[in-house]
UniProtKB/Swiss-Prot annotation:
<feature type="region of interest" description="Disordered">
    <location>
        <begin position="1"/>
        <end position="46"/>
    </location>
</feature>
<dbReference type="GO" id="GO:0042144">
    <property type="term" value="P:vacuole fusion, non-autophagic"/>
</dbReference>
<dbReference type="GO" id="GO:0005524">
    <property type="term" value="F:ATP binding"/>
</dbReference>
<dbReference type="InterPro" id="IPR003593">
    <property type="entry name" value="AAA+_ATPase"/>
</dbReference>
<dbReference type="Pfam" id="PF00004">
    <property type="entry name" value="AAA"/>
</dbReference>
<feature type="modified residue" description="Phosphoserine">
    <location>
        <position position="58"/>
    </location>
</feature>
<dbReference type="Pfam" id="PF02933">
    <property type="entry name" value="CDC48_2"/>
</dbReference>
<comment type="function">
    <text>Required for vesicle-mediated transport. Catalyzes the fusion of transport vesicles within the Golgi cisternae. Is also required for transport from the endoplasmic reticulum to the Golgi stack. Seems to function as a fusion protein required for the delivery of cargo proteins to all compartments of the Golgi stack independent of vesicle origin.</text>
</comment>
<protein>
    <recommendedName>
        <fullName>Vesicular-fusion protein sec18</fullName>
    </recommendedName>
</protein>
<dbReference type="InterPro" id="IPR004201">
    <property type="entry name" value="Cdc48_dom2"/>
</dbReference>
<dbReference type="InterPro" id="IPR041569">
    <property type="entry name" value="AAA_lid_3"/>
</dbReference>
<dbReference type="InterPro" id="IPR003960">
    <property type="entry name" value="ATPase_AAA_CS"/>
</dbReference>
<dbReference type="InterPro" id="IPR003959">
    <property type="entry name" value="ATPase_AAA_core"/>
</dbReference>
<comment type="similarity">
    <text>Belongs to the AAA ATPase family.</text>
</comment>
<keyword id="KW-0677">Repeat</keyword>
<keyword id="KW-0931">ER-Golgi transport</keyword>
<dbReference type="GO" id="GO:0043001">
    <property type="term" value="P:Golgi to plasma membrane protein transport"/>
</dbReference>
Length: 792
């Protein structure tokens, strides 16, 4: 057998007695695959034994103390040479140990140290069953790729403030215990620089050389797993909580207080549609905590202390904060709703803030940089951290809370073991000092999910339906993802609940009393259920269809060539906003006489864009509001539009919104300036906005220089002549007959003495509807139109 496959045997003093030995008794086949030169141990395959001489000890064995401290430090079970000749034994078919035969040791006994007895839950004089163990056999232990151990001083009365070199400790540990078997949870005491160090195996990762090469080893804390320590095993030490032991900052090994949970996987987070946001948060806030402290010290940087998550309601801000707490190997996060901080007693609100940081301060004083991470999560942060000086009242409680939070996060006594996560829907209300680097420096907008994100969310929320066979095959998740534009994650969850309610309702007997039908096993959620749910659940940041459709009740009548040209020009602006790389904002003014159809045309262009966000701003929605409330309302609509990738805002009758009247004249300059600013304000990167505004007072807007705020202007004229009037009244039932229309138009021309009309289309349609109620429709229509046509 090639001697390179022999592993060192432990001497009585716990050191290699000879460089190589046969791993098992018996003979080996000369045809077995052996190692080749220039191959690492993990690339080689050991030769396989042809037969094994395994002796089964008879009768139970009794647990006794190890013979000496030196023997206890070998991590071996002391046995009699008359009982065992093998190096490994398995006790009660669960714990594997290396053995050390000691002449004169009583037969039928196992000498176990205190760590052995603690790990195996043994009592002195306890009877156990023992068998030989073959780590190289088909059911043996694989080789350890890596192992993490938690260390502390065994004797709390004999410690030192001198930091230990973790790499030096790992080399000594590897050489002292090479070829021994280790499992998660196993306890061991070893000597390092004359100090007894107590270690507990936390996780291991194994590589089985017999079945594959270069396999990706995964860390596991499963106590049933075990592996064989080799000279190539990577060993990492982490100090125990509240331990006085100190480890030097390493340039190659991670921090001693690991930031991530063992075995953490990103795919287990269960966050749909937020992959890029979560990756950015991890890169900015946690990546530096994974690197060795020595490397971080060399860079001279501090870890990120605060993250601000902002965005519309229901988009997953709280979910990300909750999942971050699960991901990190830290204490249970302190979750605080903003208003809970406030208290009616003087000074108590500030005291509540100090209490949140008390544990972190205490541990940082005791352990310094070795302190564990403390996470504090503030929900509805804008409730307690408004801009200082903006709150009403003379108590100043809000300002004092902000001051206290600023001091705790980045004051004179800085803490480097905290992570504050704030969540809000109103980032604009947060005090600027809290948003600077050193405090809540990572600002992450959790916006509405795109189509790919919505598909992920739909799959997550319907996974249980699909796995249980309740989801019909006709449900296409990709179709639903395309139909749920601007739906937040919470609204998608509501959509699925609504679809389920339709499925439930099909199995309810409606009579004198509601009862469930017997065929419950046939409950299925199908495509029609989701389509019905889409008519019930509307996104908060979606299309104001009812408002806009009410402006185009009868549709658009192409009574003249200019109407088609206006629609075509409007479509060009829509395509410009959607596709142009240079213009993310386009504002268009539709001007014309009263009742000329400006609002209907603007609404038609907006609805035809099929943008996910379409809103109407009109004076109707602001009735009863004072000036400040109107400004806030208009600003809120524009802020909401910035949350959608593609948006259209229809601003109807600007002169009514700004309270303009010709007598005086009078108007609200605050509203005027607000609109002029918002019409020119560029949306954030990745967001596009089309503004369609209407006015019947273009001359007034020109005098106010407001027309300069628009990129383009479209004139919407009145109905000019009887030819255009004929095309309009064709759509009215009472004038469907061509002879009736010809008679009507001739009588109108005779009445007015001209073929000119110059009346708005909306006014004409209103006159026609009124005339339909009269017995003599034609006469009523002609008389009303004659009064409406302006006389020259």
């Amino acid at each position: 057998m090639d001697s390179r496959w022999k592993l060192p045997f432990m001497s009585n003093k716990g050191t290699p007695e000879q460089p190589m030995r046969k791993p098992l008794s018996g003979s080996y086949s000369h045809n077995s695959a052996g190692p080749t030169p220039n191959m690492s141990p993990f690339e080689q395959k050991p030769p396989l034994p042809t037969h094994m001489d395994v002796r089964r000890p008879s009768g139970p064995f009794r647990i006794v103390k190890a013979t000496s401290t030196e023997d206890a430090l070998t991590n071996c079970i002391i046995v009699s040479p008359m009982d065992f000749k093998q190096q490994y034994i398995i006790v009660d078919n669960s714990r594997v140990f290396s053995t050390k035969p000691v002449p004169g040791f009583p037969q039928g006994c196992l000498g176990a140290s205190q760590p052995h007895r603690e790990w195996a839950s043994w009592s002195l004089n306890q009877q156990v069953h023992v068998a030989d163990y073959d780590p190289y056999g088909p059911h043996g232990a694989p080789y350890l790729h890596s192992m993490t151990l938690e260390v502390d001083f065994q004797n709390r009365n004999r410690t030192t403030n001198e930091p230990f070199d973790g790499e030096e400790m790992a080399k000594l540990f590897c050489s002292s215990y090479q070829s021994q078997v280790f499992s998660p949870g196993q306890k061991i005491v070893f000597d390092f620089r004359s100090y007894n160090i107590k270690a507990t195996v936390r996780t291991i990762s194994c590589v089985d050389l017999l079945i594959g090469e270069n396999q990706d080893a995964e860390n596991t804390a499963d106590t049933s797993k075990r592996g064989l320590l080799t000279s190539q095993t990577e060993i990492q030490f982490f100090k125990a909580a509240h331990s006085a032991l100190r480890l030097k900052a390493s340039m190659t090994r991670p921090a001693s207080n690991a930031i991530l949970q063992p075995g953490f996987k990103f795919e287990d987070m269960g966050i749909g549609g937020l992959d890029s946001e979560f990756s950015a948060i991890f890169r900015r806030a946690f990546a530096s905590r994974l690197f060795p402290p020595g490397m971080v010290e060399k860079l001279g940087i501090n870890h990120v202390k605060g993250i601000l998550l902002y965005g519309p309601p229901g988009t997953g801000k709280t979910l990300i904060a909750r999942q971050i707490g699960k991901m990190l190997n830290a204490r249970e996060p302190k979750i605080v709703n903003g208003p809970e901080i406030l208290n009616k007693y003087v000074g108590q609100s500030e005291e509540n803030v100090r209490k949140l940081f008390a544990d972190a301060e205490r541990e940082y004083r005791d352990r310094g940089e070795e302190s564990g991470l403390h996470i504090i999560i503030f929900d509805e942060l804008d409730a307690i951290c408004k801009k200082r000086g903006s709150s009403g009242g003379d108590t100043g409680v809000g300002d004092q809370v902000v001051n206290q939070l600023l001091a705790k996060m980045d004051g004179v006594d800085q803490l480097n073991n905290i992570l504050v996560i704030g969540m809000t829907n109103r980032k604009d209300m947060i005090d600027e000092a809290l948003l600077r680097p050193g405090r809540l420096e990572v600002h992450m907008e959790i916006s509405l999910p795109d189509e790919h994100g919505r598909l992920q969310i739909l799959k997550i929320h319907t996974s249980r339906m699909a796995s249980n066979g309740i989801l019909e095959n006709d449900v296409d998740m990709e179709e639903l993802a395309s139909l749920t534009k601007n739906f937040s994650g919470a609204e998608i969850a509501g959509l699925i609940k609504s679809a389920s309610s339709f499925a439930f309702y099909r199995h309810i007997k409606v009579g004198t009393t509601a009862a469930v039908s017997g065929n419950l096993e046939n409950i299925k959620v199908n495509r029609n259920d989701f389509l019905n749910a889409l008519s019930e659940v509307r996104p908060a940041y979606g299309v104001s269809e009812e408002e806009l459709e009410s402006r185009v009740q009868g549709g658009i009548i192409n009574f003249g060539k200019h109407i088609e040209e206006i629609i075509t020009e409007g479509k060009l602006f829509v395509q410009q906003v959607k596709n142009s790389e240079r213009t993310r904002l386009v504002s268009v003014l539709l001007s014309g006489p009263i009742a000329s159809g400006k609002t209907a045309l603007a609404a038609t262009i907006a609805l035809g864009s099929e943008f996910p966000f379409v809103k109407l701003v009109s004076a109707e929605s602001m009735v009863g509001m004072n000036e400040n409330a109107r400004v806030a309302h208009v600003n809120r609509v524009f802020e909401d539009s910035y949350k959608s990738p593609l948006s259209v805002i229809v601003v109807d009758e600007i002169e009514r919104i700004i309270d303009w009247v010709p007598i005086g004249p009078r108007f609200s300059n605050t509203l005027l300036q607000t609109l002029m600013v918002l019409f020119k304000k560029q949306p954030p990167k990745g967001h596009r906005l089309l503004i369609l505004a209407t006015t019947s007072e273009r001359t007034m807007l020109s005098r106010m220089d407001m027309t300069q705020s628009f990129d383009a202007e479209i004139a919407v004229p009145n109905v000019s002549n009887v030819t255009e009037l004929d095309r309009i009244i064709q759509s009215i039932d009472s004038f469907a007959d061509s002879n009736v229309r010809a008679d009507t138009l001739q009588r109108l021309q005779n009445f007015t003495g001209t073929d000119a009309v110059n009346v708005g289309v909306a006014k004409i349609l209103m006159i026609a509807e009124t005339a339909k109620q009269d017995v003599d429709v034609v006469s009523c229509f002609v008389e009303a139109m004659a009064r409406a046509i302006p006389m020259e």
